């Protein structure tokens, strides 16, 4: 069962990063319509990949990461809504507020369950959480700095998956880094005058 969850969660999350990279390449070519389609696809597959990830994290008692991953759903939906609308103006505020409620709940439960921050896994989860929440929020708002936060997320999540015996998810994190760096590089090319 965990193998299937790895392939589903890891596969859809990897597609998200690939599609984000394709979107940035299309923007650099001046094809905003194609960039928007890739961005819509990227947020859609991200949402589909969420449940397998949450199940995996819960099964290892990674409460911080699991609750934050689940609380990232509103930011993912926000990204999809913004991509569908084609504008970052007037996003639904309730999505932001909903995500913020889930974060302290997961963190608090992890502290309760483990009696404080007592494991390397919890420290890795904190890095994963920061990268995921800040990165997803910034990318939903179409801000390039979100890619840098995703680097933190992928490094800490990859390490966590490695030590917990999920080689496919570890590999998926490494491959995702390639696409994240590429997407960020594309945003920087647009900023440099030719």
Name these PLM-found stretches.
Residues 1-194:
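Alpha-helical membrane-protein topology signature
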């Amino acid at each position: 069962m965990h193998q299937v969850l790895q392939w589903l969660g890891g596969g859809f999350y990897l597609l998200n990063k690939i599609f984000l990279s394709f979107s940035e390449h299309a923007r650099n070519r001046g094809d905003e319509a194609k960039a928007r389609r890739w961005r819509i696809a990227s947020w859609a597959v991200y949402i589909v990949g969420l449940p397998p990830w949450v199940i995996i994290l819960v099964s290892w008692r990674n409460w911080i990461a699991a609750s934050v991953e689940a609380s990232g759903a509103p930011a993912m939906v926000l990204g999809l809504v913004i991509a569908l609308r084609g504008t970052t103006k007037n996003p639904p505020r309730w999505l932001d507020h909903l995500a913020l409620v889930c974060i302290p709940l997961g963190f608090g439960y992890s502290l309760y369950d483990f009696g404080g921050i007592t494991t390397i896994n919890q420290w890795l989860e904190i890095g994963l959480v920061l990268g995921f929440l800040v990165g997803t929020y910034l990318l939903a708002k179409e801000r390039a700095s979100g890619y840098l936060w995703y680097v933190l997320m992928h490094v800490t999540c990859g390490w966590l998956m490695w030590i917990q015996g999920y080689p496919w998810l570890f590999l998926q994190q490494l491959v995702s880094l390639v696409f994240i760096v590429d997407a960020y590089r594309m945003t920087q090319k647009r900023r440099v005058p030719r």
